[in-house]
Swiss-Prot record:
Position of the signal peptide: 1-24
Stretches the record annotates as Disordered: 111-137, 242-267
Protein keywords: Cell membrane, Lipoprotein, Membrane, Palmitate, Signal
Annotated lipid attachment (S-diacylglycerol cysteine): 25
SUPFAM superfamilies from the UniProt entry: Periplasmic binding protein-like II (SSF53850)
Family in the record: To M.pneumoniae MPN_456 and M.genitalium MG321 N-terminal region.
UniProt entry tagged with the keyword Glycoprotein: no
Bias-annotated ranges (Low complexity): 119-130, 249-260
Membrane-protein topology: Lipid-anchor
Lineage start: Bacteria, Bacillati, Mycoplasmatota, Mycoplasmoidales, Mycoplasmoidaceae
PROSITE patterns: PROKAR_LIPOPROTEIN (PS51257)
Subcellular localization(s) per the UniProt record: Cell membrane
Gene source species: Mycoplasma pneumoniae (strain ATCC 29342 / M129 / Subtype 1) (Mycoplasmoides pneumoniae)
Covalent lipidation (N-palmitoyl cysteine), chain numbering: 25
Protein name listed in UniProt: Uncharacterized lipoprotein MPN_459
Length: 569
């Protein structure tokens, strides 16, 4: 198989518009794409391969997972032999879901028109006793098939998107149950009866539960997404109904000599919470309930915190608290906090350090063939390519093919100069060229066609970054900066609640014209409760260009950012 040349520049999330990059080496001839990172793969990452984690799974293992939705970067590359100009656009599409319906609660007037006999015979959704008669469909999205020629569109381009995002408080996803989970050999997993294990709505429910439980135990520091979207946890993954629709437990209270029954809620952190008691009663339907409409729900479902994990896997069933659980907690001020020292991370799905991959299944574009302290080897997942890939939008080049094998090397503390040397030695498929090596790179590669200026001309790509809550860590008696952030970022995070930091954060918010952004995203609403910073928001300008300050008439020299773009999105 012949590969298209890859161009990989060191582009920051604030849109540095050009970089020098090298690509194409002997590794490509073996149908292998090799990259390297300065990260320490397992440092402070006790559960690297599931939603029950400290740092985001996507940092290293995003390729083995897939979500209800995903973003696909589409566009074009123009190569004139000297420069490569990239024009990209992100498209939000359904991935493991074949369709989604948005519902809103019917008004009380409409509900009262239902007679008691009709209400009693209505079908239950299996979620907190609610019935279909209580809900009204506001719109739906269906996965676009490649044969119909319209699978290049984003969900956001559909006429129903605005209505769903602004009104829906229940999202019903239809799951593609034809795709099978595969093991670390790329073979479909079989259960104890010899049946191949297929994707189920219960896999998403367990993924949600693992993330929520981890957050409640103060282990996962990204639990704010639950509050941000306004997830109704009880209706989505709660446990107030038994497997057969029977009530799990009731409390009986005496009030004025009258016996009143009251259903007791069992929290996810309770020892008697049953992880095999599912809200999802059908394998192909998964319902997400919100307390109020959240316009970015479909976008957020592409994040790794909401990916599925195989609910039949023994180590997935072990993600709970209580007797015989590998999770150990301490109680403080009525809150349960995970005891990381006593917890047996080997006993839960995705945990166990370098051994985690051995029994981790995949439903994404790649599976993990091997994994150790220094590298991860990914192999392309045929199941994904058979069922999902054909209906995804084409990326930059219509004839490009997926890479069969990817190898990610980890060299903690390595500098760009080290990666450049590795590329020269034939160990990497691509490398960014730092300023100090540009002259050497020109002399070595200018005539080979491997050296290019990569220019991002226009993008419509969003970037979200979540930082660790531990900017500094203790190694022995030495306090060091956490490996995933810079010293400047660590200082900012360490003092994030100080008066100076709060002033800076307020200033950053002031740079965004929220009213204009709301008009673009929510034309019928004045509210906005989630924001993203587009890739390429700032434009580069020459050192000798003078820019007039907004509303002042003063000039400024030497800045690499056009000041006008501080006020635009």
């Amino acid at each position: 198989m012949k590969f298209q040349r890859k161009y990989w520049g060191l582009l920051s999330t604030l849109g540095v518009s050009s970089a020098v990059a090298l690509s194409a080496c002997a590794a490509q001839a073996r149908d292998v794409y090799v990259t390297s990172s300065a990260s320490d793969l397992l440092k402070n990452n006790l559960v690297p391969m599931s939603m029950f984690n400290v740092s985001p799974t996507s940092s290293f293992f995003g390729s083995k997972y897939a979500g209800l939705t995903t973003y696909i970067a589409t566009g074009s590359n123009k190569d004139d032999g000297v420069n490569v100009t990239s024009q990209t656009q992100e498209k939000l599409v359904l991935e493991l879901a074949t369709s989604v319906k948005g519902y809103k609660k019917k008004t009380s007037t409409a509900s009262n028109m239902k007679t008691a006999s009709v209400s009693s015979s209505s079908s239950s959704t299996g979620n907190n006793g609610s019935t279909e008669d209580e809900w009204e469909v506001v719109g739906s999205e269906i996965k676009r098939e490649s044969g119909k020629g319209d699978n290049g569109k984003s969900i956001t381009e559909d006429s129903n998107f605005q209505t769903i995002s602004q009104q829906a408080t229940r999202y019903e996803f239809t799951i593609d149950t034809s795709i099978k989970w595969v093991d670390n050999n790329g073979k479909p997993v079989k259960d104890e009866k010899g049946q191949e294990v297929k994707l189920s709505s219960k896999d998403f429910e367990r993924g949600f539960e693992a993330y929520i439980l981890s957050s409640e135990l103060r282990f996962n520091r990204n639990g704010y997404f639950i509050d941000l979207m306004g997830l109704d946890v009880e209706k989505t993954v709660g446990m107030t109904n038994g497997k057969n629709g029977t009530q799990v437990k009731k409390m009986t209270t005496d009030s004025s000599s009258t016996q009143q029954s009251e259903e007791k809620k069992i929290e996810i952190t309770d020892d008697n919470y049953d992880p095999e008691d599912y809200r999802s009663t059908s394998d192909d339907k998964f319902n997400v309930y919100l307390t109020s409409p959240f316009p970015f729900l479909l976008s957020m479902m592409s994040k790794e915190f909401f990916f599925p994990i195989p609910h039949t896997h023994p180590k997935v069933k072990a993600i709970k608290v209580g007797p015989n659980s590998p999770l150990v907690y301490n109680e403080k001020n009525s809150a349960k906090i995970l005891d990381q020292t006593k917890t047996n991370f080997d006993g839960i799905y995705g945990g166990g350090g370098v051994n985690a991959w051995r029994d981790a299944w995949s439903v994404g574009p790649y599976y993990v063939e091997s994994f150790n302290q220094s590298q991860i080897v990914f192999k392309r997942n045929k199941e994904y390519d058979d069922h999902i890939t054909p209906n995804l939008p084409k990326t930059r080049e219509g004839n490009e093919q997926p890479i069969p094998t990817m190898i990610n090397y980890f060299q903690p503390g390595a500098t760009p100069e080290v990666f450049y040397s590795n590329y020269i030695a034939g160990g990497l498929s691509s490398a960014g060229v730092s300023y100090s090596q540009q002259e050497d790179a020109r002399s070595r590669f200018a005539s080979t066609g491997d050296l290019r200026w990569v220019k991002v001309q226009k993008t419509a790509q969003s970037a979200q970054i979540t930082y660790s809550s531990r900017p500094y860590i203790l190694e022995g008696e030495t306090v060091k900066t956490n490996s995933n952030i810079t010293e400047t970022e660590a200082k900012f995070l360490y003092n994030s609640e100080s008066e100076e930091a709060l002033t800076i954060r307020a200033g950053i918010n002031g740079l965004i014209n929220w009213q204009n952004l709301a008009i673009i995203l929510l034309p019928n609403s004045g509210d906005l409760n989630y924001s993203i910073v587009p890739f390429g928001i700032f434009k580069e300008k020459g050192k000798d260009v003078q820019v007039k300050q907004k509303n002042t008439g003063q000039a400024s020299q030497g800045s690499d950012l056009m000041n006008d773009y501080y006020y635009k999105i």
